[in-house]
């Protein structure tokens, strides 16, 4: 760059900073522009690895969608529990009016510290979200769900009234307002969404999500969660085998997958993931039905091995750290939090 151009650029930058404030424009090599992305663990080791950065990125919009009873709300409650372990504050906008507080507590959520709102309209839900984000004091907000964000005009109208595109316009306007503030306040905002079928689609995927296309564009991460099987114990179904696919990721390569178990009344089985990922990484040995670690047997069958790790959290943590090391994923700063969760399991 010539001296004349450099001088003109410096003058332009000075004018922009004077008009819009310091930090409104900067070089990528300066200060916070190159800082590592701050993340919140999902509570699933496999999903943290699939996301590429160790969790869900803060200061971004995340969409989690899937069929009914696929584990969407369970996953977000696990993220809230992980955030609370490191001292964060979370809010849950329950537009569906269906949050089970007792279930949230079982997943490790500190319910007395969780902010909960059950708004009457979509506008009210998004205004509350905007106010919380602008306060700068909230670390994470969950909106459950986009499909339940009913516009005021629809609520006040008659059953059967045709109001095309109303919800999509509401979401588009809200996200235009929210995105910049979310980035500045470093708040993680998760939208839970449902799946609908497009009528008349002959080729391609007929599935789509509610609320228009705005959320697809504004989301930095989109997770597709599906139940792919049942977990049985003595012919009794005790949980679901779940697959999460990272269909969009602006902070790491997308299209990675994670498979984990969700146990009824417990949430994501951390110990089950450690066993599965340990076997894949050849850290845990499997011979027939027996699992062993460092030459010592830890259980016959996955259930017994899971129980062993639950009773020996220090061994579980050691295996987890070795898995992270082998995959090049830095150990999470909230590592101590898992030991607390294991201690809670032992008390139960």
UniProtKB/Swiss-Prot annotation:
What Gene Ontology terms for biological process does this UniProt record contain? Answer: DNA recombination; DNA repair; SOS response
Q: Which SUPFAM superfamilies match?
A: P-loop containing nucleoside triphosphate hydrolases, RecA protein, C-terminal domain
Instruction: Spell out the GO cellular component terms annotated for this protein, sorted alphabetically and separated by semicolons.
Output: cytosol
Sorted keywords for this record are: ATP-binding, Cytoplasm, DNA damage, DNA recombination, DNA repair, DNA-binding, Nucleotide-binding, SOS response
Residues annotated to bind ATP: 66-73
Q: Principal localization? A: cytoplasm
Q: Which GO terms describe its molecular function?
A: ATP binding; ATP hydrolysis activity; ATP-dependent DNA damage sensor activity; damaged DNA binding; single-stranded DNA binding
**Gene3D superfamilies membership:** P-loop containing nucleotide triphosphate hydrolases
- Record flagged with keyword Cytoplasm: yes
What the entry lists under InterPro entries is as follows: AAA+_ATPase, DNA_recomb/repair_RecA, DNA_recomb/repair_RecA_CS, P-loop_NTPase, RecA-like_C, RecA-like_N, RecA_ATP-bd, RecA_C_sf
Q: Where in the cell is it found?
A: Cytoplasm
UniProt lists the family membership as follows: Belongs to the RecA family.
Q: Which PANTHER family match?
A: MITOCHONDRIAL DNA REPAIR PROTEIN RECA HOMOLOG-RELATED, RECA
Q: What does this protein do?
A: Can catalyze the hydrolysis of ATP in the presence of single-stranded DNA, the ATP-dependent uptake of single-stranded DNA by duplex DNA, and the ATP-dependent hybridization of homologous single-stranded DNAs. It interacts with LexA causing its activation and leading to its autocatalytic cleavage.
- In Swiss-Prot or TrEMBL terms, this protein is called Protein RecA
């Amino acid at each position: 760059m010539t001296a004349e151009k450099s001088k003109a650029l410096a003058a332009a930058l000075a004018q922009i900073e004077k008009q819009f404030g310091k930090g409104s424009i900067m070089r990528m090599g300066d200060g916070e522009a190159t800082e590592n992305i701050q993340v919140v663990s999902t509570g699933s080791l496999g999903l943290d690895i699939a996301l590429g950065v160790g969790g869900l990125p803060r200061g971004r919009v995340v969409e989690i969608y899937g069929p009914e009873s696929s584990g969407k709300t369970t996953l977000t409650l696990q993220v809230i529990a992980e955030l609370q372990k490191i001292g964060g504050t979370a809010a849950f906008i329950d537009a569906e009016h269906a949050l089970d507080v007792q279930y949230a507590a079982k997943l490790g959520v500190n319910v007395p510290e969780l902010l909960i709102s059950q708004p009457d309209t979509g506008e009210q839900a998004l205004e509350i979200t905007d106010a919380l984000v602008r306060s700068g004091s909230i670390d994470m907000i969950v909106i459950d769900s986009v499909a339940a964000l009913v516009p005021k005009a629809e609520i006040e109208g008659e059953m059967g009234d045709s109001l095309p595109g109303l919800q999509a316009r509401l979401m588009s306007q809200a996200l235009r307002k929210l995105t910049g503030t979310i980035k500045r306040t470093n708040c993680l905002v998760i939208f839970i969404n449902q799946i609908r079928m497009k009528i008349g689609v002959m080729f391609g995927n007929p599935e789509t999500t509610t609320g228009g296309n705005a959320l697809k564009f504004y989301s930095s991460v989109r997770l597709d969660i599906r139940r792919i099987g049942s977990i049985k114990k003595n012919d009794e179904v005790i949980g679901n085998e779940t697959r999460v696919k990272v269909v969009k990721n602006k902070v790491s390569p997308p299209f990675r997958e994670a498979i984990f178990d969700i146990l009824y009344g417990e949430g994501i089985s951390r110990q089950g993931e450690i066993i599965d990922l340990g076997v894949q990484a050849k850290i845990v040995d499997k011979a027939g039905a027996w699992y062993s670690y460092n030459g010592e047997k830890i259980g016959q069958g996955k259930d017994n091995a899971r129980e062993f790790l639950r009773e020996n959290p220090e061994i579980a943590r050691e295996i987890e750290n070795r898995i992270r090391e082998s995959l090049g994923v830095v150990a999470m700063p909230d590592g101590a939090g898992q030991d607390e969760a294991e201690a809670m399991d032992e008390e139960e």
